[in-house]
Amino acid sequence: MSDVSKASLPKAIFLMGPTASGKTALAIELRKVLPVELISVDSALIYQGMDVGTAKPNAEELHAAPHRLLDILDPAQAYSAADFRRDALAEMAEITAAGRIPLLVGGTMLYFKALLEGLSPLPSADPEVRAKIEQQAAEQGWSALHKQLEEVDPVAAARIHPNDPQRLSRALEVFFISGKTLTELTQTSGEALPYQVHQFAIAPASRELLHQRIEQRFHQMLASGFEAEVRALFARGDLHTDMPSIRCVGYRQIWSYIEGEISYDEMVYRGVCATRQLAKRQITWLRGWEGIHWLDSEKPEQSYNEVLQVVGAIAD
């Protein structure tokens, strides 16, 4: 697309960053002075009843800056990148039609990528094929299916852990339905985002600072009732660790503690480690991302002014 035709597109802002980097706080401040509406880009914040462990904005923050695509699903429900793209595009169109600018804020990079670049034409899920895969897994174990995936799609197998049944079964399902590998199909991009996007990423200048923030926040969450929140989910009886909601960082570790698999101290240690690993993956994604304006989360006023400088011009 030419620069001229790009300039005629409606405007949108991405505010990305690793967990515990201050994205939400910055977005809320920006909402006070810019004609923007916030859309959450977070695969954990979509779930109802998962507030403490996801660092969901509180009632006061949401009153000041309402977030769309927040609390839209029960934790028993699944939600794909395709679902997000569909919902985000609908919200963006509504915001743009009202004469305002969509500000998409979050840390789920796969959602941002799906929105920006479009999705490859993957086949829809087939319950019959999925049932056969699950039956085979019950008989032979998921490690045997992982070896099967290694034979047909070694690239996908290298990315998918043998203990990740959801992604493993999907990769095999795609191959059985289409005769093409997940790797082949994902190399075919879909429809690009019909917006002129200004992209920002916020993170601390040093990894040590981010690690400190993560550890402090995890302890704050525990002090704010994180364990009680997970116990309430556990008590429902219809949720389990194969579900994306319960695999969210922190939730999975507390779940293991509740089941008696690990001690409290081990749960805290694993929860902090898992959150740090998530942040590392998020930063790796962002470093390979083109067209990003980086912001230092340790300098909130400077970050705020930098965004205003760029966005102020497009918001006039």
From Swiss-Prot:
Keyword Cell cycle: no
Secretion signal, residue range per the UniProt entry: none
Cofactor(s) named in the record: Mg(2+)
InterPro entries in the cross-refs: Dimethylallyltransferase, IPT, P-loop_NTPase
Sites marked Interaction with substrate tRNA: 108, 130
Residues that hold substrate according to the record: 19-24
EC identifiers of the protein: 2.5.1.75
Keywords of this entry: ATP-binding, Magnesium, Nucleotide-binding, Transferase, tRNA processing
GO molecular function, one term: ATP binding
UniProt xrefs under Pfam families: IPPT
One of the GO BP terms on file: tRNA modification
Annotated stretches, region: Interaction with substrate tRNA: 42-45, 166-170, 247-252, 280-287
Binding locations of ATP: 17-24
Reactions catalysed, as given in the entry: adenosine(37) in tRNA + dimethylallyl diphosphate = N(6)-dimethylallyladenosine(37) in tRNA + diphosphate
Assembly notes: Monomer.
Family listed: Belongs to the IPP transferase family.
Function: Catalyzes the transfer of a dimethylallyl group onto the adenine at position 37 in tRNAs that read codons beginning with uridine, leading to the formation of N6-(dimethylallyl)adenosine (i(6)A).
NCBIfam families: miaA
Protein name: tRNA dimethylallyltransferase
Organism: Enterobacter sp. (strain 638)
